[in-house]
């Protein structure tokens, strides 16, 4: 070993990655045929956080020596970490041709399929790794995560327990074990697991969020609210934790824990008065005061957070609004022959309505508008819209140059109390005889035309909807009272409405 090589190794072992990199790069220049020097240079770039540069040096090493297993496995992992899943799969498979028992290649290939949400394929590679090396923590924790995604919570708990036994200091293992126990309905076991995670890392806000969920399952609202508040505080007021805390307050209020909720809602408002989620939900819960619409920042932040899991959550709620709107479309336009129209999906979300609206749209005639960039990314992936706009819907309708033959809006008006400006904007953006089909949540609780429910959503009376449509110039074609979704142990009812623009 040369003196420079020894120096490079010592720097790397001491965590002095920049100095190590300088030495390895010099060695690589002096000995361009040494793939191990190139791999070591890549390792330094990786340790310094430059994954792209690391991948470049691993690729150089692979080109120098096609049979270098470290070059291939490190290249495959770097490609995975930089999001190039196709290359990550290719190089992992090449590594396995060199060594069918390469644990890094097997794990990385499993990770590729996990990222693609092909969980059955991911399991295959994680199992191989676990069989080759019994007691391998990485394989056990990955198996636990994958079974959890497959909703096999018993298997997830088994592998999470194994992972925790292998590494008792793993927060990930304990939280995964706790979440699997929650799903299995073993709430005391969940509390024990989350408590162990909190002992290891008392600064992680998500652990307190999980503790809050476990206490909530046991109807221990005092403990649930205190841990939910700790999650907000320890996160420094992170938006996801504000949203979770708002829903926790709502659910606690439904369970008659009003005295606790009021105090926390007021404290929440006092501590974070400028946050749109806090302003909207806190006021709804503490004193019922509200603006005529939910703040755009509140709506945007809520759906940006929920976007990746939005459709899975809706499925669990038996969400029916898109199907109900499709039923109205079929009743109005028929099953087979129907006009081709320019259509706006107002508050398109992830594109649940866009999937069936496409066949009603004229050439390049389906547009979607939504406040949430996160939701629009999910909608774009469906490749059904010709145009997607990130904007508040009333603002878009008031300023758009085109005129639509149809505007559809599923479960969006529940974030608007006073619908007068919206209906006026809809009327202006529709062609003569154009239609709007939408859903609203029913106000069966009082005599107000609309009011802000403790859920943070607005409820509307049927009489108000009918009266305002007629005042705006619409002809009410059809209105039907329907169950829209579940919420906790309750059913949420509302109206599906179709109205046609009259006049010039």
Model-derived features: where do they sit?
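Class I SAM-dependent methyltransferase SAM/SAH-binding core
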Residues: 344, 349-396
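A short acidic, Gly/Pro-enriched loop at the edge of an enzyme's catalytic core
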Residues: 398-407
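A short glycine-rich, Lys/Arg-flanked "PGG" loop and its adjoining helix->strand segment in the class I
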Residues: 420-432
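Register position in tetratricopeptide repeats
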Residues: 13, 47, 81-82, 115, ...
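Short, glycine-/aromatic-enriched active-site segment of Class I SAM-dependent methyltransferases
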Residues: 438-458
């Amino acid at each position: 070993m040369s003196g420079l090589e020894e120096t490079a190794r010592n720097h790397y072992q001491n965590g002095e990655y920049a100095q190590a990199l300088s030495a390895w790069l010099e060695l690589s220049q002096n000995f361009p045929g040494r793939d191990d020097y190139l791999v070591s240079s890549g390792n330094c770039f990786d340790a310094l956080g430059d994954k792209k540069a690391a991948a470049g040096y691993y690729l150089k090493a692979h080109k120098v020596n096609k049979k270098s297993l470290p070059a291939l496995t490190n290249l495959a992992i770097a490609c995975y970490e930089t999001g190039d899943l196709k290359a990550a799969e290719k190089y992992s498979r090449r590594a396995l041709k060199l060594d069918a028992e390469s644990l890094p290649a097997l794990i990385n290939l499993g990770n590729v399929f996990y990222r693609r949400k092909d969980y059955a394929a991911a399991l295959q590679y994680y199992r191989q790794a676990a069989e080759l090396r019994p007691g391998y923590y990485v394989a056990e924790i990955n198996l636990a995560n994958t079974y959890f995604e497959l909703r096999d919570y018993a298997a997830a708990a088994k592998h999470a327990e194994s992972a925790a036994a292998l590494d008792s200091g793993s927060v990930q293992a304990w939280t995964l074990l706790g979440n699997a126990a929650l799903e299995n309905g073993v709430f005391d076991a969940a509390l024990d697991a989350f408590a162990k995670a909190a002992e290891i890392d008392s600064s992680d806000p998500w652990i307190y969020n999980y503790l809050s969920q476990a206490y909530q399952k046991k109807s221990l609202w005092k403990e649930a609210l205190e841990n939910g508040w700790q999650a907000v505080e320890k996160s420094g007021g992170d938006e996801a934790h504000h949203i979770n805390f708002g829903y926790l307050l709502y659910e606690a209020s439904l369970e008659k824990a009003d005295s606790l909720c009021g105090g926390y809602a007021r404290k929440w408002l006092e501590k974070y008065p400028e946050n749109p989620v806090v302003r909207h939900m806190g006021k709804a819960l503490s004193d019922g005061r509200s603006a005529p619409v939910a703040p755009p920042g509140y709506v945007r932040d809520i759906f940006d957070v929920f976007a990746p899991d939005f459709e899975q959550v809706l499925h669990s709620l038996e969400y029916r609004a898109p199907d109900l709107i499709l039923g109205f479309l079929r009743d109005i336009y028929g099953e087979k022959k129907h006009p081709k129209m320019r259509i706006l999906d107002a508050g398109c979300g992830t594109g649940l309505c866009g999937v069936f609206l496409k066949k009603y749209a004229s050439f390049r005639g389906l547009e979607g508008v939504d406040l949430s960039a996160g939701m629009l990314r999910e909608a774009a992936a469906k490749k059904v819209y010709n145009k997607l706009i990130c904007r508040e819907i009333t603002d878009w309708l008031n300023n758009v140059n085109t005129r639509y033959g149809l505007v559809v809006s599923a479960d969006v008006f529940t974030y608007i109390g006073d619908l007068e400006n919206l209906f006026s904007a809809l009327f202006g953006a529709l062609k003569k005889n154009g239609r709007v089909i939408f859903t609203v949540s029913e106000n069966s609780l009082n005599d107000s035309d609309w009011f802000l429910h403790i859920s943070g959503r607005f409820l509307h009376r049927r009489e108000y909807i009918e009266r305002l449509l007629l005042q705006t110039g619409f002809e009410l074609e059809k209105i039907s009272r329907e169950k829209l979704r579940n919420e906790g142990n309750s059913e949420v009812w509302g109206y599906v409405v179709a109205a046609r623009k009259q006049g010039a």
